Amino acid sequence: MAAAVRPGAEPWNRVRIPQAGNCSTLTVRDPSATLDICTAAVTKGCHLVTQSLKSQTLDAEVDVLCSVLYSNHNRLGHHKPHLALRQVEQCLKRLKHMNLEGSIEDLSQLLSANATQPGATENRVVPSQPVVEVVLMKVLGGCKLLLRLLDCCCKAFLLTVKHLGLKEFIILNLVMVGLVSRLWVLHKGLLRRLISLYEPLLSLRQEISSIHPMPYFKDFAFPSDITDFLGPSYLEVFKVKTPAASATKGVTKLLNKLFLMREQLPKMNEDTLDRLSKPSEQMTSNPQSTVDLGQPVKACKRTRKEKPLGFDLRAFCTRLGNKATQETNRDFKYSQSKLKTTKLPSQQLRTHWANDTVQRIRKTKTFAQLSEEIEMAIVWSRSKKLKTQATFLGNKLLKSNRFRHVESQGYSLTKKLQCMKTSLCNCLLRGSRTSTSEHPPRQRRSKYKVLSRQRKPQRKLQSTLLKETQQVPEGTLKNTRDSSAKRRCSGTVQRSDVCPNGKQVLRKLAKPDLKTKVVVHGNLTGGSRNESGFQAKTQMHTHNAPDTAKEADDIDDIFALMGV
């Protein structure tokens, strides 16, 4: 019957509290007025708590929190504001797994059953003591958990504001600040409603225990005052004013720069006011603007010599003649030539600026000085519309700012400073080093050139071998018949390197017949074929000749000398 509690573990601190196994309702005859008052207060409190738990705004904020954490996990996984938001998410998940909403709904359904039943004045159905005690325990645990959630929200708020002072991820930090503040407000209202629900629940438990005592948590005494149970964290949230953060001084200036109110906008100069007032004066001085719309206006006809007063649509409908096209072409050519002449000085200015910034970067000794130089470089590159260089320098600025804060705590980062300086100098000297769009075509061109260079000597070798094989003597064929016959008897053909021995033999040979020329050419073009194929070719080429067997033997001897 009673809930088993582990030694040292408090029952309100558990995520899952087991339900009572006995009957959940109790019929009371002739209920007292105090019982009616308690049940009415409990039903009202349960309705308010369920309304705040099921609010769509709270669900939307929780969904936004989960999506922000999921989308920025890889980029901001080790940042302190991100970790604080992770703690907020853990508290929300624990609150969901407690099933506080379900237990409160069950209790409200048991209390509202008396209104539907007839004759409820004589007999009253109330929840049993174990059901009320389970809800009381969940209310205590929910209040403690909500206090922890509010603390995590405050911590995340302060860390995001501090991170906002670094001028990094400004939009994301603003979103996180607004999200955390809204979650803090919503859950503070939920905590207030849970605290107001605890007192009528405790009085209802006392009334039910006096009618039919059936305790569920025997080793735990429910506190009479929940504020004493919650401790100083409750006073920090509700009664003590939160102190202003010291790190928000620079943040307010930054936010004022980003979001200026209409009252804070700078006043216009007299020159701008005069410029704005001139066209209005011209409009008033124009006689056409002073026409009374209530009277009929006489349309005055224009003569041919008079020019149109305002916008004429027929000028756009007429086609341009040859003279106009020639003038436009001349203007376009002149603009192109002007661009070519102005291209060299812009490149010279860029190289001069890059050399100056590299010298200044090399002289820096701390990350604070380096970040200042990077900021100046970013401003210059953005003014010259160098997007790739600006993005590269922006990423380096983020890293240097982080190392600057680490360096301010007393750590020496000389190696990291040197590495960052070298990477920045290389980027500035080589121009668009970070852009990867230029590298693949260069690699393809170089590979194509290497392949074309390697193919040319192969063609030369083939032509020289053809020329040399055409010079084959008749006297050496007889000397090589014996070696070819021996290899035929053994039945194995040993293949070795063809080029060196074949070249030496072919250089010593004399001119052959016309028939042998055709056969050797077939060997060089199709070197992967076997001896039977070559013999078939020789027979097809020399089927009219009487001594085909001798020529075939001579050809076999030549290939044997070559090692084929």
From Swiss-Prot:
May play a role in cortex development as part of the Notch signaling pathway. Downstream of Notch may repress the expression of proneural genes and inhibit neuronal differentiation thereby maintaining neural progenitors. May also play a role in preimplentation embryo development. Disruption phenotype: Knockout embryos die before preimplantation. Pfam families: NEPRO_N. Residues 460-473 have a biased composition (Polar residues). Residues 431-495 are annotated as: Disordered. Belongs to the nepro family. The gene is Nepro. The keyword Nucleus applies. Its main location: nucleus. The lineage of its organism: Eukaryota, Metazoa, Chordata, Craniata, Vertebrata. One of its GO terms (cellular component) is nucleus. Residues 442-460 are annotated as: Nuclear localization signal. It is found in: Nucleus; Nucleus, Nucleolus. The keyword Nucleus applies. Keywords: Developmental protein, Nucleus. This is Nucleolus and neural progenitor protein. Residues 442-459 have a biased composition (Basic residues). PANTHER family: NUCLEOLUS AND NEURAL PROGENITOR PROTEIN. One of its GO terms (biological process) is negative regulation of neuron differentiation.
